[in-house]
């Protein structure tokens, strides 16, 4: 087994855990904060935007069972990559989408994946997700961990709303793409 780490930010971390955690080869998914200037930030500090942190998930995975490229594919399916100022209902820099890379190999894979998404025509606006060097990852408070199991009704409502929003955004992008090609 060869363990690797990936860190992705994509809005509220509650909706980022389950889609990764249920995959074979995923060893752990932790909700937390990264990219800020305060050690051991709390949720309230991050929410207030005073700490400079972004909500993110840290994924430990067995790269012999699931690849970083597969994780990138999952990540892109969970976010609106055209929105740099948060995701869905969660607005502000603390909810911005970011791919935090651990190595040059991850950086190259993330860049290739981003370019492929741009060329796909799925989205009608530019892909604006930055690829940044991984910084210290601080686990969030325990009540945030595996939230989808702790409050399944609330999680499902948020998750379904997020899925509907993303489906609508993708549809709008495809519709505009098709209209451009028929003129």
From Swiss-Prot:
EC number(s) stated in the UniProt entry for this protein: 1.8.4.11
The enzyme class is oxidoreductase
Residues of the active site: 12
The UniProt catalytic activity note for this protein reads: L-methionyl-[protein] + [thioredoxin]-disulfide + H2O = L-methionyl-(S)-S-oxide-[protein] + [thioredoxin]-dithiol; [thioredoxin]-disulfide + L-methionine + H2O = L-methionine (S)-S-oxide + [thioredoxin]-dithiol
Q: List membrane-spanning regions.
A: none
Query: Which Pfam families does UniProt cross-reference here?
Result: PMSR
Which keywords does this chain's UniProt record carry? Oxidoreductase
**GO molecular function terms here?**
L-methionine:thioredoxin-disulfide S-oxidoreductase activity; peptide-methionine (S)-S-oxide reductase activity
* GO BP terms in the entry: protein modification process
Task: Give the InterPro entries listed for this entry.
Answer: Met_Sox_Rdtase_MsrA_dom (IPR002569), Met_Sox_Rdtase_MsrA_sf (IPR036509)
> NCBIfam families in the record, alphabetically?
msrA (TIGR00401)
Q: Which HAMAP family match?
A: MsrA
What does this protein's UniProt record list under function?
A: Has an important function as a repair enzyme for proteins that have been inactivated by oxidation. Catalyzes the reversible oxidation-reduction of methionine sulfoxide in proteins to methionine.
Kindly give the PANTHER family that the UniProt entry links to this protein.
PEPTIDE METHIONINE SULFOXIDE REDUCTASE, PEPTIDE METHIONINE SULFOXIDE REDUCTASE MSRA 2
What is the similarity comment for this entry? Belongs to the MsrA Met sulfoxide reductase family.
This protein is called: Peptide methionine sulfoxide reductase MsrA 1
Q: Which gene encodes it?
A: msrA1
């Amino acid at each position: 087994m060869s363990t690797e780490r990936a860190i992705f930010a994509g809005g509220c971390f509650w909706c980022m855990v389950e889609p990764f955690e249920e995959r074979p080869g995923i060893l752990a998914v932790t909700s937390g904060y990264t990219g800020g200037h305060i050690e051991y930030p709390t949720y309230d500090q991050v929410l207030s935007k005073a700490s400079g942190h972004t909500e993110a998930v840290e994924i430990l995975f067995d790269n012999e069972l699931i690849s970083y490229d597969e994780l990138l594919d999952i990540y892109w399916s969970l976010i609106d990559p055209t929105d740099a100022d948060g995701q869905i209902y969660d607005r502000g820099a603390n909810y911005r989408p970011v791919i935090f890379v651990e190595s040059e190999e991850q950086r190259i894979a993330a860049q290739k994946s981003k370019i492929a998404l741009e060329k796909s025509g799925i989205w009608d606006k530019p892909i604006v997700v930055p690829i940044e060097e991984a910084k210290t990852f601080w686990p969030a408070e325990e009540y945030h961990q595996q939230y989808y199991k702790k409050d399944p009704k609330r999680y499902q409502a948020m998750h379904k709303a997020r899925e509907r929003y993303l489906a609508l955004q993708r549809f709008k992008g495809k519709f505009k793409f098709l209209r451009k090609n028929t003129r």
